[in-house]
């Protein structure tokens, strides 16, 4: 029996710790914060429940065990299926019933595709962040950040297209500008220090800047439509504000590490800030999808006003 156990075990080394067996397929060991490699040490208030030092096969199998990444993985895996299902429903029911044009189909498809990519990249990172190869972990981290950029791009594409639906010039200006910003973020990831913990604050500033840029086209849209008193502005501006409020709330949870900061070790598996960040990200993207459908239906029900189309 002892020999069979040894043959079915994958051994790892924990620095100054002794060798521990990681049994296949169900005996994936969970570690404390002190035992994990430095690349995983992001939140000292999450004290236990870490997966680490696993090969790819066991990383995948860890999808079905309870760890401190379980909610992070499944929240965005379910988020992916949500947006995939919405894509099918939109293409087969919502858009045809609204007499949508070919452009509408393209824009809505791009938007939902970006959301799905964002969800899958996040799932991939949180699933394989426990890989025994630090190089592999960093590749998945880079994909996670790329996925966030793509998700932001999806919001901008649909938002700019329908906000400047009646003004082709400004629509092209803002779409090109946003695309250039996203590409700049991609190129920034090439820097060897981009994914290090020392650059964590800079990464946050970059993504806040890219997200916050949306205030500029929003204010321009308000001005083009006659100011805050215009009916269309009063109808749609609150939707933009709600989206930004959800994003801000999610970001505050992310950077503050609240509530686990006040309950260290008690929220290792459920209720941590990163899990709340994940759930709010899904809520935000879903809200923006619903807003996109709403404004698309509005654009097809009312013609463009002359004072906008000539500006």
Swiss-Prot record:
One of its GO terms (biological process) is negative regulation of neuron projection development. One of its GO terms (molecular function) is ubiquitin-like ligase-substrate adaptor activity. Pfam families: HlyIII. Widely expressed in a range of tissues. The chain crosses the membrane at residues 74-96, 106-128, 141-163, 173-195, 202-224, 239-256, 276-298. Residues 1-73, 129-140, 196-201, 257-275 are cytoplasmic. InterPro entries: AdipoR/HlyIII-related (IPR004254). Residues 1-20 are annotated as: Required for interaction with SREBF2. Keywords: Golgi apparatus, Membrane, Transmembrane, Transmembrane helix. Residues 41-60 are annotated as: Required for interaction with SCAP. It is a multi-pass membrane protein. It comes from the Eukaryota. Golgi-scaffold protein which modulates its interactors acitivies by anchoring them to the Golgi apparatus. Functions as a spatial regulator of RAF1 kinase by sequestrating it to the Golgi apparatus. Acts as a positive regulator of cholesterol biosynthesis by mediating the anchoring of the SCAP:SREBP complex in the Golgi apparatus, thereby promoting SCAP:SREBF2 complex formation, potentiating SREBF2 and SREBF1 processing and enhancing lipid synthesis. This is Progestin and adipoQ receptor family member 3. It comes from Homo sapiens (Human).
């Amino acid at each position: 029996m002892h020999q069979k156990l040894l043959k079915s075990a994958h051994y790892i080394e924990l620095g100054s710790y002794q060798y521990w067996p990681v049994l296949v397929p169900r005996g994936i060991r969970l570690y404390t914060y002190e035992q994990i490699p430095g690349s995983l040490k992001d939140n000292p208030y999450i004290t236990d429940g870490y997966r680490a030092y696993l090969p790819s096969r066991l990383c995948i199998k860890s999808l079905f065990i309870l760890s401190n990444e379980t909610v992070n993985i499944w929240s965005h895996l379910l988020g992916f299926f949500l947006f995939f299902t919405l894509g099918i429903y939109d293409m087969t029911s919502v858009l045809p019933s609204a007499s949508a044009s070919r452009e509408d189909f393209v824009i809505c498809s791009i938007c939902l595709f970006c959301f799905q990519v964002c969800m899958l990249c996040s799932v991939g990172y949180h699933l394989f962040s426990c890989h025994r190869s630090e190089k592999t972990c960093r590749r998945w981290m880079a994909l996670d950040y790329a996925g966030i950029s793509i998700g932001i791009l999806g919001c901008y594409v649909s938002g700019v297209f329908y906000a400047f639906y009646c003004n082709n010039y400004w629509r092209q200006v803002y779409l090109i500008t946003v695309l250039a910003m996203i590409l700049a973020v991609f190129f920034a990831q090439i820097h060897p220090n981009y994914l290090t913990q020392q650059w964590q604050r800079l990464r946050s500033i970059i993504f806040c800047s890219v997200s916050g840029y949306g205030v500029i086209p929003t204010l321009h849209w308000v001005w083009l439509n006659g100011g805050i008193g215009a009916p269309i502005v009063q109808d749609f501006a609150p939707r933009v504000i709600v989206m930004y409020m959800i994003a801000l709330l999610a970001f505050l949870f992310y950077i503050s590490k609240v509530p686990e900061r006040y309950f260290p070790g008690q929220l290792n598996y459920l209720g941590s800030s990163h899990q709340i960040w994940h759930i709010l990200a899904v809520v935000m993207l879903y809200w923006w999808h619903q807003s996109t459908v709403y404004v698309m239906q509005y654009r097809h029900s009312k013609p463009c006003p002359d004072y906008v189309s000539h500006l």
